[in-house]
Design a protein with these regions (language model features):
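Glycine-rich phosphate/adenosyl-contacting loop at the front of the ribokinase-like
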Residues: 1-78, 88-89
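Conserved phosphate-binding/catalytic region of the ribokinase-like
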Residues: 1-7, 12, 26-32, 37, ...
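Alpha-helix C-terminal capping segments
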Residues: 65-74, 118-121, 286-289
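Hydrophobic beta-strand scaffold residues
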Residues: 75, 101, 184-185, 242
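A glycine-rich helix N-cap at a beta->alpha junction
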Residues: 93-110
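Conserved phosphate-binding/catalytic loop of the ribokinase/pfkB sugar-kinase fold
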Residues: 102-106, 118-163
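A short, aliphatic-rich alpha-helical micro-motif
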Residues: 145-149, 205-206, 236
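Conserved beta-alpha-beta core of the PfkB/ribokinase-like small-molecule kinase fold
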Residues: 153-233, 249-251
Length: 329
């Protein structure tokens, strides 16, 4: 069985992206700048209202895995898609990106492939309206222990915490990975996701994970505080590696007694979709290569900077060349 440097488990979502202005968001009743879960009917209304749609395989951790695969890691993604047009598109697109899509599209059943309508406003802010469909039904049976148990690194998506079988799949996969000598971590995904499942998040982080990646709001939400320093200290007390992205203020990484802060160059994003996902791709690439945490953060920042320079959540440049130019490879 193949050994992977990086395996991700998350929602397999087709992103449908369109540009708009704030008046459109207000007219359609879309809350700016956050991810909202919607029902199937609402999804059809929003899809019909989109202008000049761009369709791409998405899902937070899937984007990360694709980015890391593009950098040259042996990578695999575990997620559920239906055997419909969008599901077949998704599976093929992941394969085309150099990522092994472990589970074939699922035939039968009523739930279609998940999709997220993403509206990008003039300031680059993304407003996501996601119909989860079949992807949220992921369970332990979708996670082969032959894949999880042979992963060097495993990365889990917090959004899958919304169903008990997703939580169970995570715990089992994390334990398989660690028993096989790998390291397992999580993308916190969203402060609201933490609010819904705080106790389970903290238990998983403390007992089953080796690293956590989240933005400032997500890290704060773990311990219900507005004080980032307090949140970082408390998270670091239960997890050996904590990575906190702070948008234009850079990245803070805490590993045991070591702490580094890596600045970023402030730019106006064309599209902020995927910035955190591609940061994680770069950081995990560095981890897989055994690089220091500061270099990992710099690689992550470079990957994030590239993806916010264009529409879409995955890199368009050959990132290995970009990293070489910047002296990071």
């Amino acid at each position: 069985m193949k050994t992977y440097q990086l395996v991700g488990i998350g929602n397999a979502v087709v992103d449908v992206i369109s540009q708009c202005d704030d008046s459109f968001l207000e007219h359609m009743g879309i809350e700016k700048g956050i991810m909202q879960l919607i029902e199937r009917d609402r999804g059809e209304v929003l899809y019909a209202a989109m202008q000049e749609r761009v369709q791409t395989p998405g899902g937070s951790v899937a984007n990360t895995i694709a980015g890391a695969g593009a950098l040259g890691l042996e990578a695999a993604f575990i997620g559920r898609v239906h055997d419909d047009a969008l599901g077949r598109f998704y599976a093929q697109a992941m394969t085309d990106d150099g990522v092994d899509f472990v589970n074939p599209p699922v035939a039968g059943g009523e739930l279609p492939t998940s999709r997220s309508m993403i509206f990008v406003s003039g300031d680059g802010e993304r407003s996501m309206n996601t119909y989860l469909g079949i992807s949220s039904e992921l369970s332990s049976s979708d996670v082969p222990d032959t894949v999880a148990g042979k992963a060097q690194l495993m990365f889990l998506e917090g959004y899958l915490f919304d169903k008990d079988k997703g939580k169970t799949a995570f715990m089992e996969a994390a334990r398989d990975c660690r028993e096989g000598g790998g390291k397992c971590g999580i993308a916190i995904s969203d402060p609201f996701c933490v609010e819904r499942h705080r106790a389970d998040f903290l238990s998983l982080i403390e007992n089953d994970l080796d690293f956590v990646i989240g933005n400032e709001a997500e890290i704060k939400s773990l311990f219900e505080t507005d004080d980032l320093e307090e949140a970082l200290a408390k998270t670091a007390a239960i997890c050996s590696l904590v990575v906190c992205t702070r948008s234009g203020d850079g990245v803070t990484v805490v590993q045991g007694d070591s702490r580094v802060s890596v600045p970023v160059e402030r730019v106006v994003p064309v599209d902020a979709t995927g910035a955190g996902d591609q940061f994680a791709a770069g950081f995990l690439f560095g981890m897989a290569k055994g690089l220091g945490i500061e270099t990992c953060a710099k690689i992550g920042n470079a990957c994030a900077a590239e993806v916010i320079s264009h529409i879409g959540p995955r890199p368009k440049a050959v990132m290995s060349q970009v990293l070489r130019r910047e002296g990071l490879l």
